[in-house]
């Protein structure tokens, strides 16, 4: 089985376009994976097309994994715990695709302490916060991101028209030990 765990540190430290760490662009740098077009997040694994990949987020299929025609992926690194890429000979439970499986597991949240980060980038801002609800029993993880493309584009658009050129992502998870 050709499974590869993608280290979270590698995702966060990969040189990026527009200052935003991106899971799919990091995967494009791995052997056997090619990008569709420069700067976009389409994946061609071992000759297959982007529609032949299965992307799972905690076991749930994701059919549209990017924003702005592939410039940004929907996955924020702070919300991810583990990423596994299967480039061939994947288990039968992942059936239905020809090229690859990207299995993403989200962060469970810290059972002991509260902590978080706020980051402001060239085109996006992010917030990540996690901690216990009930220590050693229940935790949460909350991550949000918003672009300000609408603010950047405003000076170039007619004054009588308002366009909403932006997107936002919110990932929330509550984890409880029974």
Region annotations inferred by a language model:
Residues 121-146, 159-178:
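Transmembrane beta-barrel wall of Gram-negative outer-membrane proteins
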Residues 110, 126, 148-154:
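Gram-negative outer-membrane beta-barrel proteins
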Residues 90, 152-159:
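Hydrophobic alpha-helical membrane segments
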Residues 53, 79, 112-116, 134-140:
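Outer-envelope beta-barrel architecture signal
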Residues 23, 41, 98-100, 114-116, ...:
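Hydrophobic, lipid-facing positions within transmembrane beta-strands of outer-membrane proteins
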Residues 67, 113-115, 156-161:
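Extracellular loop and loop/strand-boundary signature of outer-membrane beta-barrel proteins
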Residues 93-94, 112:
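Glycine/Thr-rich phosphate-binding loops of Rossmann-like dinucleotide-binding domains
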Residues 1-90, 101, 107-108:
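Periplasmic N-terminal accessory/gating domains of Gram-negative outer-membrane beta-barrel systems
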């Amino acid at each position: 089985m050709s499974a590869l765990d993608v280290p979270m540190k590698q995702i966060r430290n990969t040189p990026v376009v527009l200052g935003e760490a991106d899971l799919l662009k990091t995967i494009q740098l791995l052997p056997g994976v090619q990008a569709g077009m420069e700067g976009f997040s389409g994946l061609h694994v071992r000759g297959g097309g982007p529609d032949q990949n299965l992307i799972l987020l905690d076991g749930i299929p994701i059919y549209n994994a990017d924003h702005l025609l592939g410039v940004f992926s929907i996955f924020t690194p702070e919300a991810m715990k583990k990423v596994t890429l299967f480039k061939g000979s994947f288990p039968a439970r992942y059936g239905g695709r020809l090229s690859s499986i990207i299995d993403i597991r989200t962060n469970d949240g810290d059972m002991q302490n509260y902590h978080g980060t706020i980051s402001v980038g060239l085109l996006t801002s992010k917030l990540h916060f996690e901690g216990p609800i009930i220590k050693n029993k229940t935790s949460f993880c909350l991550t949000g991101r918003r672009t300000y493309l609408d603010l950047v584009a405003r000076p170039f658009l007619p004054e009588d028209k308002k366009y909403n050129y932006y997107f936002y992502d919110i990932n929330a998870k509550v984890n409880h030990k029974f």
